Amino acid sequence: MSNIEERVRNIIVEQLGVQLEEVKNEASFVDDLGADSLDTVELVMALEEEFDTEIPDEEAEKITTVQSAIDYVVNNG
């Protein structure tokens, strides 16, 4: 697991209050991890802060799974 992947997973655990074992790459924040719309906004904000980047709203809407969050940070962070 890469450092970025590990950091993204830790943010998800902290923001959504889930166990690390639940944070699988294919897991949907809403369907699998129980996030609501406010949780997803806060998650994106936490990613922006951790990786010192700004995620435009249209891109943030596409970040719906653990893997999509990792991919975004790897490609744009």
UniProtKB/Swiss-Prot annotation:
GO annotation, cellular component aspect: cytosol; membrane
Modified sites of kind O-(pantetheine 4'-phosphoryl)serine: S37
An annotated GO BP: lipid A biosynthetic process
Keyword tags: Cytoplasm, Fatty acid biosynthesis, Fatty acid metabolism, Lipid biosynthesis, Lipid metabolism, Phosphopantetheine, Phosphoprotein
Main localisation: cytoplasm
The protein's annotated pathway: Lipid metabolism; fatty acid biosynthesis
Localization per record: Cytoplasm
Post-translational changes noted in the entry: 4'-phosphopantetheine is transferred from CoA to a specific serine of apo-ACP by AcpS. This modification is essential for activity because fatty acids are bound in thioester linkage to the sulfhydryl of the prosthetic group.
GO molecular function per UniProt: acyl binding; acyl carrier activity
Occurrences of domain Carrier (ranges): 2-77
NCBIfam families: acyl_carrier, PRK00982.1-2, PRK00982.1-3, PRK00982.1-4, PRK00982.1-5
Biological role: Carrier of the growing fatty acid chain in fatty acid biosynthesis.
The protein's name: Acyl carrier protein
Species in which this protein is naturally found: Psychromonas ingrahamii (strain DSM 17664 / CCUG 51855 / 37)
Name of the encoding gene: acpP
